[in-house]
């Protein structure tokens, strides 16, 4: 990170099943001649102190990206909180001294280039425990800043309480919300369907 803010890792959550696109890995679908995941990495890598990829199944399918691939540590595909937990636990075990992880969806090709800076600055300004992104009046809880020290509490919530929704988790803490403009391109546009892919293709010429 090119700032005096705390060291921060990024985890790209690529564990979605992609049912609305006929199955497979959504981040591997192409827009602008490149995989969505290429766009995500290009935008995140300059901002953070390391990138992780959260995905289940055979990690070899992501080998060309040369990133650590970490699977959900909780069985049953419990959603993005499991991917966040995977990143927090991996960071604690492998990157001593790094206290923060930012999560991002693997199907968001237009992520803001100031994502980490603004999340960290808002957390500090508000004295918050966590921070999440928003645009156009909509909160995007999958795009968030998470404290590594909360990993045991998150594991307990997932395993013992069967908690699945991110907003139920964040409600337990002081939360900062950071808004970005949603025009001309919503930076948190996500490609969930084939129609979304076509729209993303059109938007690539307008994104910064």
Swiss-Prot record:
CDD domains per record: MobA
E.C. numbers: 2.7.7.77
Flavoprotein among keywords: no
Sites where the protein binds GTP: 13-15, 26, 54, 72, 107
GO terms of biological process kind: bis(molybdopterin guanine dinucleotide)molybdenum biosynthetic process
Gene Ontology cellular-component annotations: cytoplasm
Role description: Transfers a GMP moiety from GTP to Mo-molybdopterin (Mo-MPT) cofactor (Moco or molybdenum cofactor) to form Mo-molybdopterin guanine dinucleotide (Mo-MGD) cofactor.
Family statement drawn from the similarity comment of this UniProt entry: Belongs to the MobA family.
Xref: NCBIfam families: molyb_mobA (TIGR02665)
Protein name: Molybdenum cofactor guanylyltransferase
Organism: Chelativorans sp. (strain BNC1)
Gene it is expressed from: mobA
């Amino acid at each position: 990170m090119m700032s005096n803010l705390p060291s921060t890792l990024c985890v790209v959550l690529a564990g979605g099943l992609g049912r609305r696109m006929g199955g497979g890995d959504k981040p591997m679908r192409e827009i602008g001649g490149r995989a969505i995941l290429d766009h995500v990495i290009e935008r995140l890598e300059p901002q953070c102190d390391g990138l992780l990829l959260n995905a289940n199944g055979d990690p070899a399918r992501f080998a060309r990206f040369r990133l650590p691939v970490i699977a959900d540590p909780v069985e049953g595909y419990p959603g993005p909180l499991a991917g966040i937990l995977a990143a927090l636990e991996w960071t604690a075990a492998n990157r001593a001294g790094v206290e923060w992880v930012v999560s991002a969806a693997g199907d968001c090709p237009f992520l803001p280039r100031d994502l980490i800076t603004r999340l960290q600055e808002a957390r500090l300004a508000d004295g918050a425990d966590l921070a999440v992104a928003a645009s156009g009046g909509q909160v995007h809880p999958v795009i968030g800043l998470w404290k590594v020290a909360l990993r045991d509490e998150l594991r307990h919530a997932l395993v013992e309480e069967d908690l699945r929704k991110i907003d139920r988790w964040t409600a337990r803490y002081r939360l900062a919300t950071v808004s970005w403009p949603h025009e001309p391109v919503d930076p948190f546009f996500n490609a969930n369907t084939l129609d979304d892919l076509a729209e993303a293709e059109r938007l690539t010429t307008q994104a910064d």
